[in-house]
């Protein structure tokens, strides 16, 4: 690579960084179960003017269903209908149509129809995610038992996202507030199965993913990560045989 190539490469990377910092974060929001509280949460959240100053929302849902909820709740909520995520405009609540045809709304009662609508919105959002049309995905509440499609059994958002992204992608379930981020080493397991899943490879994977997320997503240049012991008073063997060796092997401190 010549000096000119290096200069051009650096200039391009700098321009991309500036563009990312200049534009607002694009937040995709799926409407969840159409008989639930998804649209109420969306409309009330974006009734605050400062929300549109923070981000550009793209609602994956249905204008007809949104209008039904708006009328039922007697809310003053405006949205702009778009055909593609790339058409989203800053300063507006952008509504991307994911549902063809009519969907019966029965407020407060999850149905197969409302579950299908939730899954269709998720499917469309994940397709756009793979095309990098938005920066972050927020999902409104849905009822997992009604979100099963033909040849597919919905087992929660984390599992769904991993399957949708493919390529062996594995996520980390996290709980976050303003001061702390907690990542789970295991989730969805019976108590009797937890210890067997506390392995060096698993701990290494979770710690490294958490470390990368702290730097990339939260702009923490030198994250400090605490790994919690498994046993009360460290009275087992997992700490000595698994946790401490995994920490020593991370090479991130």
PLM ranges: what are they?
Residues 3-15:
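Asp/Glu-rich intrinsically disordered low-complexity tracts
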Residues 3, 17-253:
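Anion-binding alpha/beta catalytic cores of soluble intermediary-metabolism enzymes, centered on
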């Amino acid at each position: 690579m010549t000096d000119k190539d290096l200069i051009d490469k650096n200039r391009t990377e700098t321009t991309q960084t500036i563009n990312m910092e200049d534009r607002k974060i694009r937040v995709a929001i799926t409407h969840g179960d159409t008989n639930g509280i998804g649209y109420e949460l969306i409309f009330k959240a974006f009734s605050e003017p400062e929300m549109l100053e923070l981000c550009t929302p793209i609602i994956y849902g249905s204008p007809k269903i949104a209008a039904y909820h708006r009328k039922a709740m007697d809310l003053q909520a405006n949205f702009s209908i778009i055909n593609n995520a790339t058409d989203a405009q800053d300063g507006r609540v952008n509504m991307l149509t994911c549902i063809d045809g009519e969907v019966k709304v029965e407020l407060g009662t999850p149905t197969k129809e409302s579950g299908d609508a939730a899954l269709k919105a998720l499917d469309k959002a994940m397709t756009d995610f793979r095309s990098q049309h938005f920066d972050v995905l927020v999902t409104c509440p849905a009822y997992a038992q009604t979100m099963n499609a033909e040849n597919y059994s919905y087992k929660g958002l984390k599992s769904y996202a991993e399957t949708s992204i493919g390529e062996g992608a594995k996520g980390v379930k996290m709980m976050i507030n303003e001061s702390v981020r907690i990542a789970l080493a295991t989730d969805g397991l019976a108590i009797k199965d937890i210890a067997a899943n506390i392995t060096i490879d698993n701990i290494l994977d979770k710690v490294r993913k958490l470390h990368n997320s702290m730097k990339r997503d939260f702009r923490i240049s030198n994250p400090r990560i605490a790994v919690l012991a498994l046993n009360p008073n460290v009275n087992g063997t997992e700490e000595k045989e698994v946790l401490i060796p995994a920490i020593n092997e991370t090479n991130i401190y």
